[in-house]
Amino acid sequence: MDYTLTRIDPNGENDRYPLQTQETVSGDPLEQHVHRSVYMGKLENAMHDMVNWGRKNSLWPYNFGLSCCYVEMVTSFTAVHDVARFGAEVLRASPRQADFMVVAGTCFTKMAPVIQRLYEQMLEPKWVISMGACANSGGMYDIYSVVQGVDKFLPVDVYIPGCPPRPEAYMQALLLLQESIGKERRPLSWVVGDQGVYRANMQPERERKHAERIAVTNLRTPDEI
């Protein structure tokens, strides 16, 4: 599995995204520790698994929305969908108490600096979900006043397609984010281990389901969809 490595440099000059240089590395980053010491490698792996388990099962979203996609996001908090099953029901009014931000809706150029400032105020570790076609690529607003994708100024972890996406799509994005967090390798301390953040490169759902869709021979009628 390939990982994206982001080096941590607290003395870096840049104060905007991307804060650090990124590179793609192959293989599990813990393999080097396993070959050096089997006991310490297993112990460090268990520590990472335990910390990641706590992080992925207590994701607190930042109460922030831009447009109509935000309505679909908050719909998942109702009793019908019950997003509390995934531990992501605690909305935070302050970015300093939130774990991830959902950019739901159209991002205008005047709003981009505000979003970036809110992202910078979030504490590490933090993640970003881009929800809807407008947040992903500008949507139907191919115009000077709309940012053509929030990944122009924010590091996006999960993209949710749709205009607008259904609440089920948002909950699936939470599951994908939890899966990604479970494979992350972050420094356990500022003095222990490699000072770099390893994120597993996620396979797009389109590619993952491609073979399954090609194998379908009996298509459902429009009434059955």
UniProtKB/Swiss-Prot annotation:
Transmembrane segments: none annotated. It is an enzyme of class 7 (translocase). [4Fe-4S] cluster binds at residues 68-69, 134, 163. Its EC number is 7.1.1.-. Keywords: 4Fe-4S, Cell inner membrane, Cell membrane, Iron, Iron-sulfur, Membrane, Metal-binding, NAD, Quinone, Translocase, Transport, Ubiquinone. Gene3D superfamilies: 3.40.50.12280. Disulfide bonds: none annotated. It comes from the Bacteria. Binds 1 [4Fe-4S] cluster. GO terms for cellular component: plasma membrane; respiratory chain complex I. The keyword Cell inner membrane applies. It catalyses: a quinone + NADH + 5 H(+)(in) = a quinol + NAD(+) + 4 H(+)(out). The keyword Transmembrane does not apply. SUPFAM superfamilies: HydA/Nqo6-like. It is a peripheral membrane protein. It is found in: Cell inner membrane. NDH-1 shuttles electrons from NADH, via FMN and iron-sulfur (Fe-S) centers, to quinones in the respiratory chain. The immediate electron acceptor for the enzyme in this species is believed to be ubiquinone. Couples the redox reaction to proton translocation (for every two electrons transferred, four hydrogen ions are translocated across the cytoplasmic membrane), and thus conserves the redox energy in a proton gradient. NCBIfam families: nuoB_fam, PRK06411.1. Belongs to the complex I 20 kDa subunit family. HAMAP family: NDH1_NuoB (MF_01356). NDH-1 is composed of 13 different subunits. Subunits NuoB, CD, E, F, and G constitute the peripheral sector of the complex. This is NADH-quinone oxidoreductase subunit B. It comes from Yersinia pestis. The gene is nuoB.
